[in-house]
Amino acid sequence: MARNAMLEIEVLLTKLRDDIEASYKAKGLMASGNFAKELKLVVGGNNARITAPRYVGAMEGGRIAGKRPPLWIIRKWIEDKNKQGATIPLSAAYPIAKAIGEMGIKVPNKYNPGGVVSDVLNPARVLKLQNEIVTIIRYAIIDTLNIK
């Protein structure tokens, strides 16, 4: 019986995607939940990849100073955080945006310990995934050769 290598690899990558989402939630970084919604496993043909929103880099490693984020984004973030139980006044949007523009965001900080992705997708996990994927492909090739 031939193995479905892509299906087996998809199971591994789904677990990785789920572990990254769990890390995001465990670190208390959820505001709107968009990160979890936009964190996707995309499988097509013989390719698979995990995609995430652009701001994953800022969540992981911070944001450099220089440009103030749009006020509407900060207001939306405040509204989302307040739905999660925070009590941030909307009037704080401009001072927050100004501070981000002037100082950036350092990660880790008291609100974000960092490592939302790198704590999960660390060198040991990458090596383990490589070994598991190679094993899956190896057995799929052996199964295919045995069928013929």
Regions found by a protein language model. Give the residues of each.
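Charge-rich, low-complexity N-terminal segments
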Residues: 1-42, 47
